[in-house]
């Protein structure tokens, strides 16, 4: 691995547990919290893919809100929980092993980065709320300046770490 200089991670579902927002509300949601969380994530991914295919880009936060609205309706979650769930999504918990793995890689002088379709504000809040910001060399995002599929793919290849 001596030729490797940078390691790039996705944020949502790779470093950060997308189910953790619903899990933190499991006392209010009840036993269906995990099914609700999985449905929310599946809907979020489906909305992202469909909008990309139809060339109708929405930023990641809008997709997250839209998918939450549908998921809450389908799962019959009290609508008054919407803002709480969205606030918790902004500060998702990292998977248990993530902080230690990132620290270990950083100590080996790898440049660590996140490449995500999350907005810069979302990524910064996510990383800072979990006290991981000192571990990353760069946070990069796909959509704000490159909404079309081809453009974002070319953008990824041009990143300089």
Predicted feature residues:
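A metal-dependent, Asp-based hydrolase signature
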Residues: 48-83
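Active-site neighborhood of HAD-like aspartate-dependent phosphohydrolases
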Residues: 1-45
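Short, well-structured alpha-helical segments
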Residues: 34-41, 79-87
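Short, acidic loop-to-helix structural element flanking the phosphoryl-transfer center
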Residues: 57, 61-62, 80-114, 121-124, ...
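An amphipathic alpha-helix signature
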Residues: 22-23, 37, 41, 61-69, ...
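Short helix-capping segments at alpha-helix termini
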Residues: 29-33, 74-80, 107-108, 131-135
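Substrate-recognition "cap/lid" segment bordering the active-site pocket of phosphatases
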Residues: 113-115, 119-161
């Amino acid at each position: 691995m001596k030729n490797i200089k940078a390691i790039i991670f996705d944020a949502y579902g790779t470093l950060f547990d997308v189910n953790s927002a619903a899990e933190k509300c499991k006392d209010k949601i009840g036993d269906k919290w995990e099914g609700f969380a999985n449905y929310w994530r599946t809907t979020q991914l489906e909305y992202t893919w469909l909008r990309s295919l139809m060339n109708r880009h929405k930023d990641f936060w809008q997709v997250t809100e839209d998918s939450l609205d549908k998921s809450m309706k389908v799962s019959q979650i009290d609508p008054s929980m919407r803002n709480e769930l969205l606030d918790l999504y902004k500060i998702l918990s990292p998977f248990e092993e993530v902080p230690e793995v990132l620290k270990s890689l950083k100590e080996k002088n790898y440049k660590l980065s996140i490449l995500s379709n999350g907005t810069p504000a979302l990524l910064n809040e996510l990383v800072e709320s979990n006290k991981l910001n000192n571990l990353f060399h760069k946070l990069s995002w796909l959509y704000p300046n490159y909404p079309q599929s081809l453009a974002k793919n070319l953008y990824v290849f041009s990143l300089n770490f």
